[in-house]
Regions:
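Short amphipathic alpha-helical face segments that pack within enzyme cores
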Residues: 5, 126-130, 229-232
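Helix-to-loop junction immediately C-terminal to a conserved catalytic motif
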Residues: 91-122
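Catalytic core of membrane glycerolipid acyltransferases/transacylases, capturing the structured
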Residues: 113-190
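Non-catalytic C-terminal accessory region of glycerolipid acyltransferases
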Residues: 190-295
Length: 295
């Protein structure tokens, strides 16, 4: 999320509205300076002419090669019922088979109805299943999960030179991911504003949002620094934030084991916290990292 932070800081400093895709393709300081100059000129021209400056769309997509997709059907009741059925029939039994988790801190959610911004450490691809299992049903049933936008979009739109059967497999993975896990893209380079807007729409519909602020799986079992983009998202959503932590899963994964003894994996739930509007994003990220570390 570092690009989110830098772009927001530049927009605040120079009072301009930067194009996300052009910003993502700026590789040097000189590129950024040129982008700022061009944007400032376009903004002044739009004020003189009396119409908003035009922004390229098709060219932008050619620059990045990706156009992120945010399907609204995943938030509607038919998909919700399908997702709940698959959770209780498939995902939940699989989690208990992998390692019956010991959940602590559920008392911190008494009387909490949501929606919440849920933040957790990131150990493996099955983290979402353990988080869902630990949450009470009222939150578990309406949870949207942010995931790497570029990787998710390449599943939806595989490269043309990829074998046809692999393309089909990729699209099936994308469909199952967004339908059964309610995944949505959180891009690393461009398109994050649409991602934030989608998260806001999900919250408006009563969904909690799960993010992994480290932005990657841990490689040593320790918590990686939280990126301050989570602070920007918190300021955008303005809802209580729930810190959670998964312990024991890294040791199982690192040992190359497929299953863990009951109680070996522990999911800890903290107390929901909330920050005043316009709190510095880096301060929010540090506070949330401390909250997760201290669980």
């Amino acid at each position: 999320m570092e690009r989110v932070e830098l772009m927001s800081a530049l927009e605040d400093r120079y009072q301009v509205d930067l194009n996300e895709t052009n910003f993502a393709n700026a590789a040097t300081v000189g590129d950024l300076e040129k982008l700022l100059r061009d944007t400032s000129v376009a903004s002044r021209q739009s004020l003189v002419v009396g119409k908003p400056s035009e922004r390229p769309t098709t060219g932008d997509q050619r620059l990045t090669g990706l156009a992120f997709h945010y399907p609204r059907w995943t938030l509607r009741w038919p998909t919700t019922w399908l997702r709940l059925s698959s959770h209780y029939l498939l995902a939940r039994p699989a989690v208990f088979l992998l390692g019956w988790p010991r959940v602590t801190g559920r008392e911190n959610l008494r009387g909490v109805r949501g929606p919440l911004l849920v933040v957790s450490n990131h150990v493996s691809d099955v983290d979402v299943g353990f988080i869902q299992t630990a949450l009470p049903a009222r939150l578990r049933h309406k949870l949207a999960t942010a995931t790497g936008g570029e990787a998710l979009e390449r599943l939806r739109s595989p490269v043309p030179d990829r074998a046809w059967f692999k393309q089909i497999y990729d699209r099936v993975q994308w469909t199952l991911g967004v339908a059964l896990l309610n995944l949505f893209p959180l891009p690393r380079q461009s398109g994050f504003r649409k991602s934030f807007a989608y998260a806001g729409e999900a919250v408006d519909r009563g969904y909690s949002v799960l993010v992994f602020p480290e932005g990657k799986h841990t490689t040593d079992g320790k918590l990686c620094p939280f990126r301050s983009g989570v602070g920007l998202l918190a300021n955008n959503l303005r809802i209580p934030i729930l810190p959670m932590r998964i312990d024991g899963l890294f040791e199982v994964k690192n040992a190359g084991k497929k299953f863990a003894a009951p109680g070996k994996i522990r999911v800890r739930i903290g107390k929901p916290v909330q920050f005043a509007p316009e709190t510095d994003p880096e301060e929010i990220a540090r506070a949330l990292q401390s909250a997760v570390e201290n669980l």
